[in-house]
């Protein structure tokens, strides 16, 4: 039975409550904000339990009921008010179908109606109105309800503060999880002024939620919410929960329902805002040249930041050179240029060092540019130009006490190593530069070590050095060197250095055994024989004994063989000499000079060969040593640490004063600096030690470049007296040169086989000089040099190297190739072979050859492989009265076809024709013709005539036989006819010769079987 109708006062209260709820100003504002014609339905909410939707099983959601409000909240309120006043609210005890929206057909929300749904009657509406008792519902339940299909009905409990989303709005939580998949170049205007509540965003950077007065969008029907499995919160502040709290009061008694009250509801909702994940973009380049421009990255989404990575990868063996065309970044933006070496990233430059015109080169074939910005507007801009350049191996490390000769640093180049006199090479004598993403040498650089002992036969010149101590030595050594010169020659030993420990011993014998004459014993004399030792014969034996754990003793003994009656060849370290007689005969004069940075000491600059009977030099060779201090006034010079190349001694205090022209200044280039932490090198700007210091260094340091402001420069070096305790360094090398006094960089020289261009008329700071090479040459080094703030160039000038390789001609379709050298150096050959079914057009062998001008090229163009059918010659056919040998339909170029004629015919034309390659291919001659052979014809005629005569004779004989036979046959036939036709008139009556008196009987046989039925008529004579 339907419930009793409530009093009029209760109805008026409920109508006022619904008018406030459904017709609030907020709802009106949201309704006005919608575009014209927007029929977006209101969000779904729940009906009381016990009212499942018609047509759907009630077991799935027994406590849920989802209806959808029509677009106009005011219209819904008016209609519902009329229903309530009429007392026709729907009942909760009956199946309540969805209310049809009171809108025109074209303005209705685009939701499919469930089948067989009918409009509710006024009685049902009134019954449902009286049973409106919201029940407490958890947030999870609300989300589950949002996942149910919404019907086209009036949402009786729709909140006026909620702005519904259009049909098909995605689940906000799911949308947030898929935020990273949004296109990076999304128009920022789309998110500038949101017309719908912001969806729930979930990202790795989630901040704490705050309370706002906006409801989140409902999820898409059919998609479960992410919080379905979560427990319901302790207190729910949703509109449904606020109404559920008063359910018992609303249903308590009829008297309470009849009271005339006005209810106001405050609805608060919670929106979780999150920090957006970064918008990522990645661009890859593989062209040999191009630009990286800030316009390549997408527009920045609102309230977000952008991360872009630009990767440039070129062919193996080439690097990437970046040149800064323009850079204008905002504060907080990051622009980093990184070298990529496998998994390792090396920062080559960043935004603090990037200036226009700067050049950065990658060490491998890949370079990466990383850009990051947090700006909402005013993004920084940059433009970089990139181009490929040929990578090269690093210059191989020169072995200590050795040298290296490099033929080419590019791929395929070789480096040859050799050791100085007295040292032996340990390792490969030759290394090859291997082509790779980062070119490298084929193996580690070798080292040079001094051996412990050895034998030298047919000696001419050499050294005996203190042996190198390996790491696993036990400290004791006993070394024997035997030096044997050719017969008739003598040996001279020159002690360039001899420092023996107290317990170490050295002996020198003039012979092969230690029983020979003793020339020197370190235990018997304390002086060093700097004048040298001469052998009595052609052999010298040197013995060295040491018990030290490390190489406490050092010595350097030079030996040379010379003819008897001549002086030995002199020698000076760190210097040179000139001689009047290269055979060093009696009267020869030798003059010595020292290398820059060294001075002569311990001997004269000139010596002479004297004594005819036993020639010798009138004095010992001098020594060239790096001095401690001095005054230098040359235009250019060298300053070395004391005792260079040997380590400096402790307790040194040296001062060098350099002076150049009055209108000039000094450029000082510190090329090598290796000091201990207690040793100090100070550079002063001026002619005396004063506070104006250009630089002060200790320990290890890289190359330094300094300029003086005056024509004078002072260098002071102090080594710690306690150097044996704290250790000491190897020393330093400094070059200086006189330069003009101005505010510009020094001019750079021209390069051979190339030219240079200058960006400014004056080489001021920021000016650039660009070098280029002539055709056929590659530039080695940086092609663009920039004048830096300290008036020095960014790098050394490059040089042009002749190109000795060809570019790869490429692959040929349908073929394979065999390359003799993967580097494609001059002389490399490439052999192309076509696959089966294809024929090669062009030369199969290409060779790289060098030209006087221009780059090396290949001997011919790249061939092509074409199918056999496209090049084959068709069969020309058969000549009349002839045939072919080995008949085929198609003939490849180069194949031949042979013709033959039948007997009696003669072939006119080429017996064999050949298929000639062409476009199209053709035969080298026409089809031959088979003509009758005249000799054969006459012979055949004679044979025919002879055959005719023979046949005539045979015919005559046949006639002679045939005529009598014919006559006899005629006679017999006539007799037979006479007997058979004329027997009735004969008087001779013979048995069985007369016909019977009965007529002849004609019998026609019939057979039922059609197979045996012949249809013939047979005659039989019957005698009775």
From Swiss-Prot:
<dbReference type="Pfam" id="PF00084">
    <property type="entry name" value="Sushi"/>
</dbReference>
<feature type="disulfide bond">
    <location>
        <begin position="594"/>
        <end position="624"/>
    </location>
</feature>
<feature type="disulfide bond">
    <location>
        <begin position="873"/>
        <end position="915"/>
    </location>
</feature>
<feature type="glycosylation site" description="N-linked (GlcNAc...) asparagine">
    <location>
        <position position="474"/>
    </location>
</feature>
<comment type="function">
    <text>May contribute to specialized endoplasmic reticulum functions in neurons.</text>
</comment>
<dbReference type="GO" id="GO:0060074">
    <property type="term" value="P:synapse maturation"/>
</dbReference>
<dbReference type="InterPro" id="IPR035976">
    <property type="entry name" value="Sushi/SCR/CCP_sf"/>
</dbReference>
<keyword id="KW-0812">Transmembrane</keyword>
<dbReference type="Pfam" id="PF00431">
    <property type="entry name" value="CUB"/>
</dbReference>
<feature type="topological domain" description="Extracellular">
    <location>
        <begin position="29"/>
        <end position="958"/>
    </location>
</feature>
<dbReference type="InterPro" id="IPR051277">
    <property type="entry name" value="SEZ6_CSMD_C4BPB_Regulators"/>
</dbReference>
<feature type="signal peptide">
    <location>
        <begin position="1"/>
        <end position="28"/>
    </location>
</feature>
<feature type="disulfide bond">
    <location>
        <begin position="393"/>
        <end position="433"/>
    </location>
</feature>
<keyword id="KW-0677">Repeat</keyword>
<feature type="domain" description="Sushi 2">
    <location>
        <begin position="565"/>
        <end position="626"/>
    </location>
</feature>
<feature type="region of interest" description="Disordered">
    <location>
        <begin position="212"/>
        <end position="234"/>
    </location>
</feature>
<keyword id="KW-1015">Disulfide bond</keyword>
<feature type="glycosylation site" description="N-linked (GlcNAc...) asparagine">
    <location>
        <position position="311"/>
    </location>
</feature>
<feature type="compositionally biased region" description="Basic and acidic residues">
    <location>
        <begin position="56"/>
        <end position="66"/>
    </location>
</feature>
<feature type="compositionally biased region" description="Basic residues">
    <location>
        <begin position="110"/>
        <end position="120"/>
    </location>
</feature>
<feature type="region of interest" description="Disordered">
    <location>
        <begin position="33"/>
        <end position="77"/>
    </location>
</feature>
<dbReference type="GO" id="GO:0043025">
    <property type="term" value="C:neuronal cell body"/>
</dbReference>
<feature type="disulfide bond">
    <location>
        <begin position="745"/>
        <end position="787"/>
    </location>
</feature>
<feature type="glycosylation site" description="N-linked (GlcNAc...) asparagine">
    <location>
        <position position="576"/>
    </location>
</feature>
<feature type="glycosylation site" description="N-linked (GlcNAc...) asparagine">
    <location>
        <position position="435"/>
    </location>
</feature>
<feature type="glycosylation site" description="N-linked (GlcNAc...) asparagine">
    <location>
        <position position="618"/>
    </location>
</feature>
<feature type="glycosylation site" description="N-linked (GlcNAc...) asparagine">
    <location>
        <position position="328"/>
    </location>
</feature>
<keyword id="KW-0472">Membrane</keyword>
<keyword id="KW-1133">Transmembrane helix</keyword>
<feature type="domain" description="Sushi 4">
    <location>
        <begin position="804"/>
        <end position="867"/>
    </location>
</feature>
<feature type="disulfide bond">
    <location>
        <begin position="901"/>
        <end position="930"/>
    </location>
</feature>
<feature type="domain" description="Sushi 5">
    <location>
        <begin position="871"/>
        <end position="932"/>
    </location>
</feature>
<keyword id="KW-0256">Endoplasmic reticulum</keyword>
<dbReference type="InterPro" id="IPR035914">
    <property type="entry name" value="Sperma_CUB_dom_sf"/>
</dbReference>
<feature type="domain" description="Sushi 3">
    <location>
        <begin position="743"/>
        <end position="802"/>
    </location>
</feature>
<feature type="disulfide bond">
    <location>
        <begin position="567"/>
        <end position="609"/>
    </location>
</feature>
<keyword id="KW-0768">Sushi</keyword>
<feature type="disulfide bond">
    <location>
        <begin position="419"/>
        <end position="448"/>
    </location>
</feature>
<feature type="domain" description="CUB 1">
    <location>
        <begin position="281"/>
        <end position="389"/>
    </location>
</feature>
<feature type="disulfide bond">
    <location>
        <begin position="806"/>
        <end position="848"/>
    </location>
</feature>
<feature type="domain" description="Sushi 1">
    <location>
        <begin position="391"/>
        <end position="450"/>
    </location>
</feature>
<feature type="glycosylation site" description="N-linked (GlcNAc...) asparagine">
    <location>
        <position position="674"/>
    </location>
</feature>
């Amino acid at each position: 039975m339907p419930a009793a109708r409530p009093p009029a006062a209760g109805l008026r209260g409920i109508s006022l409550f619904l008018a406030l709820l459904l017709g609030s100003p907020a709802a009106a504002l949201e309704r006005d904000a919608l575009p014209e014609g927007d029929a977006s339905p209101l969000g779904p909410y729940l009906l009381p339990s016990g009212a499942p939707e018609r047509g759907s099983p009630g077991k799935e959601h027994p406590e849920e009921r989802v209806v959808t409000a029509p677009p106009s909240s005011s219209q819904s309120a008016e209609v519902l008010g009329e229903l309530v006043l009429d007392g026709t609210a729907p009942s909760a005890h009956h199946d309540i179908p969805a209310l049809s929206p009171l809108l025109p057909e074209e303005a209705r929300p685009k939701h499919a109606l469930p089948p067989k749904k009918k409009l509710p009657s006024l009685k049902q509406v009134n019954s449902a109105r009286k049973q409106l008792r919201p029940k407490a519902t958890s947030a999870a339940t609300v989300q589950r309800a949002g996942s149910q299909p919404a019907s086209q009905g009036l949402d009786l409990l729709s909140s006026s503060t909620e702005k519904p989303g259009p049909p098909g709005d995605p689940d906000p939580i799911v949308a947030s999880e898929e935020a990273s998949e949004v296109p990076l170049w999304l128009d920022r205007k789309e998110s500038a002024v949101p017309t719908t509540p912001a969806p729930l965003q979930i990202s790795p950077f989630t901040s704490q939620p705050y309370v706002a007065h906006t409801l989140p969008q409902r999820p898409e029907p059919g998609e479960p919410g992410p919080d379905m499995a979560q427990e319901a919160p302790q207190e729910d502040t949703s509109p449904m929960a606020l109404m559920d709290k008063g359910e018992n009061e609303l249903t308590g008694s009829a008297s309470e329902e009849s009271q005339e009250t006005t209810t106001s509801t405050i609805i608060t909702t919670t929106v979780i805002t999150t920090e957006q994940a970064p918008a990522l973009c990645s661009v890859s380049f593989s062209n040999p040249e191009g630009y990286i421009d800030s316009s390549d990255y997408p527009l920045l989404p609102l309230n977000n930041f952008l991360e872009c990575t630009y990767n440039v990868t070129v062919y193996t063996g080439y690097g990437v050179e970046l040149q800064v065309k323009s850079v204008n970044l905002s504060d907080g933006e990051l622009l980093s240029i990184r070298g990529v070496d496998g998994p390792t990233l090396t920062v080559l430059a960043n935004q603090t060092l990037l200036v226009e015109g700067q050049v950065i080169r990658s060490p491998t074939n890949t370079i990466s540019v990383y850009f990051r910005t947090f700006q909402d507007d005013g993004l920084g801009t940059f433009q970089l130009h990139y181009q490929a350049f040929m990578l090269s191996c690093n210059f191989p490390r020169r072995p200590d006490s050795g040298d290296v000769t490099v033929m080419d640093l590019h791929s395929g180049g070789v480096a040859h190593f050799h050791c100085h006199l007295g040292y032996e090479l340990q390792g490969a004598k030759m290394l090859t530069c291997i082509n790779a993403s980062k070119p490298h040498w084929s193996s580690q650089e070798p080292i040079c070590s001094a051996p412990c002992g050895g034998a030298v036969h047919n000696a001419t010149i050499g050294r005996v050095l203190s042996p190198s101590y390996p790491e696993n030595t036990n400290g004791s050594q006993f070394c024997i060197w035997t030096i044997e010169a050719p017969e008739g020659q003598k040996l001279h030993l020159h002690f360039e250095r001899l420092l023996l420990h107290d317990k170490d011993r050295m002996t020198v014998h003039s012979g092969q055994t230690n029983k020979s004459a003793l020339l020197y014993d370190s235990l018997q004399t304390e002086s060093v024989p700097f004048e040298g030792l001469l052998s009595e014969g052609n052999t010298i034996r040197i013995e060295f004994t040491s018990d030290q754990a490390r190489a406490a003793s050092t010595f350097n003994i030079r030996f040379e063989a010379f003819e008897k009656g001549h002086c030995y060849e002199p020698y000076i370290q760190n210097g040179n000499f000139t001689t009047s007689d290269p055979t060093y005969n009696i009267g020869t004069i030798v003059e010595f000079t020292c290398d820059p940075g060294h001075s002569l000491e311990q001997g004269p600059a000139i010596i002479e060969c004297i004594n005819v009977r036993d020639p010798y030099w009138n004095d010992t060779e001098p020594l060239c040593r790096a001095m401690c201090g001095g005054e230098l006034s040359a235009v250019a010079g060298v300053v070395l640490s004391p005792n260079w190349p040997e380590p400096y001694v402790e307790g040194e205090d040296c001062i060098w004063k350099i002076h150049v022209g009055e209108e000039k200044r000094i450029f000082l280039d510190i090329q090598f600096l290796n000091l201990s932490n207690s040793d100090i090198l100070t550079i002063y700007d001026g002619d005396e030690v004063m506070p104006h210091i250009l630089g002060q260094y200790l320990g290890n340091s890289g190359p330094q470049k300094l300029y003086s402001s005056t024509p004078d420069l002072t260098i002071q070096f102090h080594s710690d007296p306690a150097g044996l305790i704290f250790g000491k360094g190897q020393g330093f090398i400094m070059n200086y040169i006189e330069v003009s006094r101005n505010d510009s960089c020094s001019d750079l020289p021209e390069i051979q086989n190339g030219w240079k261009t200058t960006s400014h008329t004056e080489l001021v700071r920021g000016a650039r000089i660009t070098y280029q090479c002539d055709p056929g040459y590659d530039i080695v080094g940086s092609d663009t040099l920039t004048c830096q703030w300290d008036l020095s160039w960014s790098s050394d000038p490059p040089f042009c190297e002749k190109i000795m390789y060809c570019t790869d001609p490429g692959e040929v379709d349908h073929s394979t190739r065999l390359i003799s050298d993967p580097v494609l150096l001059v002389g490399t050959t490439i052999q192309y072979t076509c696959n089966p079914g294809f024929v090669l057009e062009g030369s199969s062998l290409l060779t790289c050859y060098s030209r006087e001008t221009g780059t090396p090229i290949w001997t011919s163009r790249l061939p092509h492989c074409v199918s056999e059918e496209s090049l084959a010659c068709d069969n020309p056919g058969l000549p009349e009265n002839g045939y072919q040998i080995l008949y085929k339909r198609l003939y490849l170029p180069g194949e031949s076809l042979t013709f033959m004629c039948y007997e009696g015919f003669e072939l006119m034309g080429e017996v064999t024709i050949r298929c000639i390659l062409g476009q199209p291919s053709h035969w080298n001659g026409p089809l031959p013709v088979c003509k009758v052979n005249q000799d054969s014809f006459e012979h055949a005629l004679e044979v025919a005539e002879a055959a005719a005569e023979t046949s005539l004779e045979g015919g005559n004989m046949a006639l002679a036989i045939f005529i009598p036979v014919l006559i006899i046959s005629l006679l017999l036939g006539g007799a037979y006819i006479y007997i058979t036709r004329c027997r009735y008139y004969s008087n001779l009556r013979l048995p069985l010769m007369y016909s019977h008196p009965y007529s002849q009987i004609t019998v026609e046989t019939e057979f039922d079987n059609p197979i045996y039925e012949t249809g013939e008529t047979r005659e039989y004579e019957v005698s009775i």
